[in-house]
Amino acid sequence: MRKPILAVVMAATLHTAMADTPTVWTLQQCIDHALQHNITLNTGRLSVLSAQEDTRESQAALLPSLSLSTTHQLGYQPFMDNGSSADKASYSGDYGLNANWTVWDGKRRRYNITQSERIDRQAQLTVEENSNNIQEQIVQLFVQILYINESVNVHQEILDISRQNVLRGTEMYRVGKLSKADLSQLEAQAATDEYNLVNAKGTLDEYKLQMKELLRLDYAADFDVAVPSASDRQALADIPPADRVMTAALAMRPEMQQAAIDIERGKTDIDIARTGKMPTVALQGGIGTNTMTGTGTSWGSQMPDNMRGSLGVTLSVPLSDNRSTKTAVNKAKLALQQAQLKEEDARRSLQLTIQGFWINATTNQQRYKAAKASVVSAQDSYELLGEQFRLGLKNIVELTNAKTTLLNAQQSRLESKYTTLLYLQLLHFYENGNMESFN
């Protein structure tokens, strides 16, 4: 009976695991899943914990160190005179408790604590930066899948139209209203449209596979994205001003905070290097005792009787260090200048990125508005030409050209629409740090 029970439990567990994984994913579900399971992010979170341990260690360096030592020795004298009252075997033990405390080191340890805290913060910012990169990759893939998915529908509609034209052309050929060459051209066009549809479906599968890889899903898992119902309206939403996005991004983005911390670390590194010229004051103290056999005194009596203690202070004043301190200070100043240049470069790169997002969003939104009108015009023109073709008033070339114009208009509408959606998403993300859900 145990095997059937085990099989039922395993099946129930598998069913539950499968039920927890959706087959149709929203943008937010993709982001949440990736942020939880991405290896780079999880590795970064471990690095944060490691940096926190370093910070605790640097803070503990302010405290005195304490150590306990004990030494035990056994002795043996095999040729001792038999008339002696002393034992041939002897034992001695030493016990010591020692403490060391650096009272002053030019504030080096304080500076090290500050640097450790900054490194800790930078480790967290690295996780945030990687998180942002992953979210940008996800939204790009998600929008690309939406675009190709709708493109597949367009190609399917075009193929359906071509097949209808083949059927009508076949009827016209039977009654002598269409030549064999024109019918062959209609059939060739239908075959081309079918090829384009298959190609679009293949591209869609490739992007879905990339998304599965990014989400760390099994390649055989069912996966599709939730198609928003209001994407047309969202593509026509107001575009946030580039200056407003830049101001928010410069204050919020982790790469800018990283660059600012690098500058602060550079300044503190100069202070640390200068401590090489500072004197160091340290205190040392200890207490100890010892015991031995052969003295006629018990171990318990020897412990307090032999107790001894010491207390000392060490003052270390650097006089000449073969220019090592000066070299360290100069190199720290150069590193600070490099950090300032990197911050300037990061600022400029971020500004150019946001400006590029804004230009792409604005341009493609205008293209989308124009493309919507072009699709309506091309659709009306094609339907009119189709009717005229059936009446024998238009030839096959004019019909094919009209269909090509319609397809190009539809593709232009889709491309501009989803490109606008992508850059609108990125602008909002750089402004407030959140991806807006597609409705």
Show the residue positions of the predicted features.
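Small/polar, glycine/serine/threonine/aspartate-rich low-complexity segments that form flexible
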Residues: 21-23, 69-101, 228-239, 271, ...
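A glycine-/polar-enriched beta->alpha junction
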Residues: 32-42, 49-65, 96-115, 125-132, ...
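Sec-dependent N-terminal signal peptides
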Residues: 4-13
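Amphipathic alpha-helical coiled-coil segments
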Residues: 43-58, 130, 134-154, 171, ...
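Bacterial Sec-pathway N-terminal export signals of envelope proteins
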Residues: 18-71, 219, 225-264, 318, ...
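Acidic, low-complexity, intrinsically disordered peripheral segments
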Residues: 6, 18-21, 76, 211, ...
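Short, charged, amphipathic alpha-helical segments
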Residues: 117, 180-189, 330, 396-404
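Periplasmic alpha-helical coiled-coil/stalk elements that build and connect Gram-negative outer-membrane
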Residues: 53, 133-248, 360, 364, ...
